[in-house]
Amino acid sequence: MKLVSIFIGLLLGWVALPSFALAADPITVQEILDEPSRFHLRQVTLQGTVRNVQPLDPYTLPAGTTCYGAYLFYLEDETASINVAAFGLCGIPTVKDPDVEDGARIELHATIQAPSHGGYYLSFQGLKVVGEREGVIQAVADRITPLPE
């Protein structure tokens, strides 16, 4: 009987978990810009329009692995815009166009980076180290989904 209770508890937890994971309502870019430390290293859902897509040259991570197909763009919603980095594929030489184009409406699942404490971020010039005083706020793309027009 105890084993059945444990099994049912695990099953209910497994069934409920995806609903919590999918329940992330989109937030505005301005919410992130207003409180970047609150969102640092958290996953968020944003919706907006793609602007200024910039493919990046291959770059090398500090560990020596080269990454290909990375690009940057701005995601603009009705409140503000935020820099978005798509890291591409590391260790696999490839030539690939960005997954988005200027003017496209998308839903973005991303991890926010606001590394004012130091760290790395991807820029138009490649991988950069953040100084203690820099206020870089960036969304790192986890999943990009086109929105219907």
Give short role names for the model-derived ranges.
Residues 6-18:
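Bacterial N-terminal signal peptides
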Residues 21-149:
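OB-fold and OB-like single-stranded nucleic-acid-recognition modules
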